[in-house]
């Protein structure tokens, strides 16, 4: 009997074991069939495959440009189905009362997946912020278990009729192409049919690729925005309070829409969310957001930069400036600085929670060390007390560091003679007789080389260095400046600007040169911004007129001058992260010059319009051209005033007078080392007080002398103002023959009478001549201001 019982138990165990094994095998087989195809490389160490721990450096082959979607209308060409839902339209009416999407409302394809499987009222009416985040990324994985952002992606629009993609497209779209051509061919001669048909095929294929690439970029940008808000800044109290209030109000609105006038639900109560099989299986695979972070930011190595103080002491994490600088009140940070590291948190969240203090940031290489010395001297003359972080990428040697530290810490009490005229402006404590004279500077060197994954260090060369400096400096609030930026106000002045304190940013505009771009660029940038469903799901606002009415969106080529940028990183980290990401997306960077526009466009694309531009476009600063030097042919003088200078300057929009900063150093011509002085002396069209090559050489190497500033006017419609009086038609003229092509002339007014005084205008009553004169801003500085500019110029150049 006992033996029989034992055999029965053994048989039962065997049956249970066999059944459990088969069940596990079934689950694994189901997961494999859902998430991998025959080309997938299955990893035994992580469901994130090669992208999490850098076991493999190459990406999987890109998918074909064509897909089965060619057989049906693309999601780019039609509104996503859920947007036609009555509830969605009702929420749109409520949420977007004062703004509308001006361009096609492109959204991430992930939303289409979500709302094809779940009711709108369930997602928007029942889910918390965290639940929405998790649902979105469950669907990212369900769509592609190996999803990652590849900074090397090429959006290649090169046309080749011999490619398989093109041939497949023509085959699938043959009837559509023929139908379209039949409507057009009456415009052409019969012998031109083949050529015109080929052009049509190329045009339609190019449009297809454009739409495909745009959708791919939108998918990525949406994922960046959502990941950052969900997992990087989700511990910030202002965000928590705002998103909780947003969702509470939204869910109440959904509930109200779902009820009839008596307060009863129309059909039934709102269903709770039930995950699909794919979404449920993702639960078995998703681990920490810190792991997924590497898929979003593969170029970040998750190593802190090395922070080296001028004393030689090295910190391997962001330094606590309040403690290091003897409890300097300017370095006190309201938030609690996180000292320890938590491996379960994303690296960027840990880094964020260590930001502290306020300071100046610049990025240099060895070739910039002389400029850096001049800048340090200037900051001492301005009595700067803020720490300075010089961010570099392993390309600043010890000799350059010694030069900069010497400039920052050496005894500096021998001042140029021009100081005598401004000494009364600074007070008795300006020169410390017991110390080192002018205020020594707290200089730090920040080596961010190891913070960038080795595969992507070349992605941030040249202008990109500034973008990384914005991220890897350790300040909560920072002023980012170029090494050739010349401050005319103490750095603390900029942090006290009202609009900076309100918004956490302060940006400056470029020269308002009437160089134009297509308005389609602006529409493209708007399409790259948040969609209406981004705002509805995650409270990430769409672009408004605050952004889309700016001159760049209306066709101006250049808008922002990035020689000085003010950002509160505690408020705007997600926008800084977006700036660094769009720097890696060719179709975006291809529409701008360098880093300039990426700062504010990064904010707008991130759904962050809490940025502020000074009202004034850049000015020309220097001395007025004598009116007789530019007289008309008849000897009369122009109404407009002119300044020709290689230096853009920035006049405060608060008072239309104060000079805040200038660019391109303080020598008259920062390209003097490259100038052919004999050639420029022979031109005799500008700088007519100079006659010989030696005079040009002396003038170019000496400090710029500033008596006036001109902010040229800009026509509202970005048009030239033609006139009959030889007045300038636009505010800027490029004088390429001087200062190695860096000279620009600015005019205090544009336009003028449409007829000369001796010409009768029969089209106007009383012989009043039409006049389209538009005035800008002409600033004349007083003797104290001029003396201060002279002193700062002498300090920068090193005049004794």
UniProtKB/Swiss-Prot annotation:
- Which sequence ranges are listed under topological domain Lumenal? 31-800
Q: Name one GO biological process term.
A: mannan biosynthetic process
Q: Where in the cell is it found?
A: Golgi apparatus membrane
Membrane-topology descriptor: Single-pass type II membrane protein
Q: In which pathway does it act?
A: Protein modification; protein glycosylation
Glycosylated at which positions? 98, 545, 656, 767
Cellular component aspect of the GO annotation: Golgi apparatus; Golgi membrane
* Stated induction or repression of this protein's expression: Expression is negatively regulated by RIM101. Expression is also increased in absence of SUR7, as well as CHK1 and NIK1.
* TM segment ranges: 13-30
Q: Which residues lie on this side of the membrane: Cytoplasmic?
A: 1-12
Q: Which Pfam families match?
A: Mannosyl_trans3 (PF11051)
> Which GO MF terms does the UniProt record name?
alpha-1,3-mannosyltransferase activity
Q: Which UniProt keywords apply?
A: Glycoprotein, Glycosyltransferase, Golgi apparatus, Membrane, Signal-anchor, Transferase, Transmembrane, Transmembrane helix
Give EC number(s), comma-separated.
2.4.1.-
* Function statement: Responsible for addition of the terminal mannose residues to the outer chain of core N-linked polysaccharides and to O-linked mannotriose. Implicated in late Golgi modifications.
Which PANTHER family would you find in this protein's record? Answer: ALPHA-1,3-MANNOSYLTRANSFERASE MNN1-RELATED
Name of the protein in question: Putative alpha-1,3-mannosyltransferase MNN1
* UniProt organism field: Candida albicans (strain SC5314 / ATCC MYA-2876) (Yeast)
């Amino acid at each position: 009997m006992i033996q029989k019982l034992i055999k029965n138990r053994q048989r039962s165990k065997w049956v249970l074991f066999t059944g459990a094994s088969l069940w596990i095998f079934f689950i694994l087989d189901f997961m494999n069939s859902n998430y991998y195809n025959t080309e997938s490389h299955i990893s035994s160490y992580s469901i994130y495959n090669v992208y999490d721990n850098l076991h493999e450096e190459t990406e999987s082959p890109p998918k074909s440009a064509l897909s089965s979607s060619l057989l049906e209308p693309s999601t780019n060409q039609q509104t996503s189905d859920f947007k036609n839902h009555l509830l969605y339209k009702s929420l749109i009416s409520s949420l977007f009362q004062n703004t509308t999407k001006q361009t096609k409302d492109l959204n991430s394809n992930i939303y289409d997946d979500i709302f094809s499987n779940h009711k709108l009222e369930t997602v928007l009416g029942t889910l918390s912020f965290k639940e929405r985040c998790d649902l979105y990324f469950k669907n990212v994985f369900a769509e592609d278990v190996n999803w990652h952002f590849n900074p090397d992606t090429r959006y290649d629009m090169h046309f080749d009729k011999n490619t398989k993609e093109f041939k497949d497209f023509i085959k699938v779209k043959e009837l559509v192409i023929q139908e379209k051509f039949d409507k057009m061919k009456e415009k052409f001669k019969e012998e031109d049919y083949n050529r015109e048909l080929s052009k049509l095929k190329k045009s339609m294929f190019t449009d297809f690729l454009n739409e495909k690439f745009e959708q791919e970029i939108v998918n990525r940008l949406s994922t960046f925005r959502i990941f950052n808000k969900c997992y990087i800044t989700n511990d910030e109290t202002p965000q928590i309070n705002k998103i909780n209030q947003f969702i509470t109000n939204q869910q109440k609105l959904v509930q109200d829409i779902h009820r009839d006038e008596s307060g009863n639900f129309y059909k039934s109560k709102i269903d709770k969310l039930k995950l699909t099989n794919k979404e449920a299986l993702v639960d078995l695979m998703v681990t920490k957001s810190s792991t997924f972070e590497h898929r979003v930011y593969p170029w970040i190595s998750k190593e802190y930069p090395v922070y080296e103080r001028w004393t030689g002491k090295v910190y391997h994490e962001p330094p606590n400036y309040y403690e290091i600088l003897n409890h300097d009140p300017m370095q006190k940070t309201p938030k609690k600085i996180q000292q320890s590291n938590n491996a379960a948190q994303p690296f960027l969240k840990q880094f964020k929670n260590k930001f502290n203090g306020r300071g100046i940031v610049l990025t240099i290489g060895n070739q910039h060390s002389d400029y850096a010395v001049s800048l340090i001297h200037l900051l001492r003359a301005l009595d700067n007390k803020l720490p300075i972080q010089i961010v570099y990428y392993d390309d600043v040697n010890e000799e350059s560091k010694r030069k900069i530290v010497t400039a920052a810490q050496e005894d500096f009490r021998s001042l140029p003679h021009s100081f005598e005229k401004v000494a009364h402006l600074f007070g008795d404590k300006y020169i410390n007789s017991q110390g080192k004279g002018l205020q020594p500077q707290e200089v730090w060197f920040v080596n961010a080389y190891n913070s960038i994954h080795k595969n992507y260090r070349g992605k941030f060369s040249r202008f990109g260095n500034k973008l990384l400096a914005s991220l890897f400096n350790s300040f909560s609030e920072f002023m980012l400046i170029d090494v050739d930026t010349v401050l005319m106000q103490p750095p603390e002045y900029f942090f006290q600007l009202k609009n900076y304190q309100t918004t956490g940013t302060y940006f400056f505009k470029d020269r308002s040169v009437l160089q134009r771009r297509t308005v389609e660029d602006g529409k493209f940038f708007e399409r790259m911004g948040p969609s209406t469903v981004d705002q509805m799901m995650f409270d990430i606002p769409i672009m408004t007129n605050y952004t889309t009415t700016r001159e760049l969106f209306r066709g101006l080529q250049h808008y922002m001058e990035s020689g000085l940028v003010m950002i509160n990183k505690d408020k705007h980290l997600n926008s800084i992260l977006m700036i660094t990401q769009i720097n890696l997306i060719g179709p975006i960077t291809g529409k701008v010059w360098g880093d300039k526009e990426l700062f504010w466009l990064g904010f707008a694309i991130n759904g962050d319009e809490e940025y502020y531009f000074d009202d004034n476009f850049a000015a020309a600063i220097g001395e007025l051209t004598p009116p007789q030097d530019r007289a008309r042919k008849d000897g009369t003088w122009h109404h407009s005033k002119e300044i020709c200078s290689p230096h853009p300057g920035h006049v405060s929009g608060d008072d239309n007078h104060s000079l805040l900063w200038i660019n391109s150093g303080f020598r008259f011509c920062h390209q003097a080392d490259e100038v052919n002085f004999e050639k420029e002396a022979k031109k005799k069209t500008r700088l007519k007080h100079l006659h010989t090559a030696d005079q040009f050489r002396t003038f170019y190497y000496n400090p710029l002398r500033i008596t006036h500033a001109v902010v040229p006017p800009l026509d509202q419609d970005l048009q030239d103002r033609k006139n009959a009086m030889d007045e300038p038609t636009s505010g800027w003229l490029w004088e390429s023959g001087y200062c190695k092509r860096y000279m620009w002339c600015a005019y205090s007014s544009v336009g003028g009478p449409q007829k000369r005084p001796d010409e009768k205008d029969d089209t106007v009553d009383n012989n009043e001549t039409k006049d389209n004169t538009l005035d800008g801003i002409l600033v004349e500085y007083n003797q104290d201001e001029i003396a201060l500019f002279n002193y700062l110029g002498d300090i920068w150049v090193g005049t004794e």
